[in-house]
């Protein structure tokens, strides 16, 4: 019997083994090892409100001989992280992004959880807790999400007047900030239907449609319509703003006032004329319901409805109704005031 195997037969014997090795190498890659020292968080999304205290959990299962823990915030729409705090387990150094409102919880020696006091609108976003031990770094990511309300905003000059930077400033002037895509999506799931496109914080331009119709994106499926990439300096749209719970209180003063008289009336009560974001927050979180139009600080006249009824808004859904921007000298409305507690 010959001791050699013909080449074709040898290839046939080798092929199944080679295919098995190839399948294991490419089809079933080894799983990426998870964190060795950091425990995975029980909740990756932490919910909070403006003015509250939020805790972002980061706990070590065991302590390496030498290490540092680095907290940073991942900026939306940008490929960079902003440093917040570094600790070596004994001492911590604050880098000032949160203005001294950030500290470590230190519930025990393996606790590196981050506490953020007096949460602000700009604190919402994605955070990273990174363990640096000089051998193999590892990290966990968490998202701080604020409860709030998204509202469309345009100036007295009419629709599509803002470039990106003007839209950002306009929201801040109305006690808000530009909404993120996730905030707009959440508002859409809660009933926001709006045909005018507006800037978002990431620099995109979108609008939410619940009832698809010809003059509002066409007869397609409901969803978030997108205008694609836009020039932040040249292109002009409205703004979608986001605000959260208030530290103070919104109240209505009846009368037939001009805008300047409205400012005087609120000042006499130790308050200021409310901003648009104040009114939306009071409607959302305090259930403010009033059929009377009132002046706001931007010169618009609006009123909040939580229980729609005849001759009180004329629309079936709750929300903040607008009379637009009447002449400031027109003495026909009361005013909504805002007072800090």
UniProtKB/Swiss-Prot annotation:
Tissue: Brain.
Keyword Signal: yes
Signal peptide location: 1-27
Top-level division of the source organism's lineage: Eukaryota
GO terms under biological process: cell adhesion; central nervous system development; establishment of blood-nerve barrier; extracellular matrix assembly; skeletal system development
Classification via InterPro entries: C-type_lectin-like/link_sf, CTDL_fold, Hyaluronan_bind_Proteoglycan, Ig-like_dom, Ig-like_dom_sf, Ig-like_fold, Ig_sub, Ig_sub2
Keywords: Disulfide bond, Extracellular matrix, Hyaluronic acid, Immunoglobulin domain, Repeat, Secreted, Signal
Keyword Transferase: no
Annotated Gene3D superfamilies: Immunoglobulins (2.60.40.10), Mannose-Binding Protein A, subunit A (3.10.100.10)
Segments forming domain Ig-like V-type: 35-143
Entries under PROSITE patterns matching the protein: IG_LIKE (PS50835), LINK_1 (PS01241), LINK_2 (PS50963)
Compartments in which it is found: Secreted, Extracellular space, Extracellular matrix
Disulfide bonds: 58-129, 171-241, 195-216, 266-337, 291-312
GO molecular-function terms, A-Z: hyaluronic acid binding
GO cellular component: extracellular matrix; extracellular space; node of Ranvier; perineuronal net; synapse
All residue ranges annotated as the Link domain in the record: 149-243, 246-339
Family under the similarity heading: Belongs to the HAPLN family.
Function: Mediates a firm binding of versican V2 to hyaluronic acid. May play a pivotal role in the formation of the hyaluronan-associated matrix in the central nervous system (CNS) which facilitates neuronal conduction and general structural stabilization. Binds to hyaluronic acid.
Protein's name according to its UniProt entry: Hyaluronan and proteoglycan link protein 2
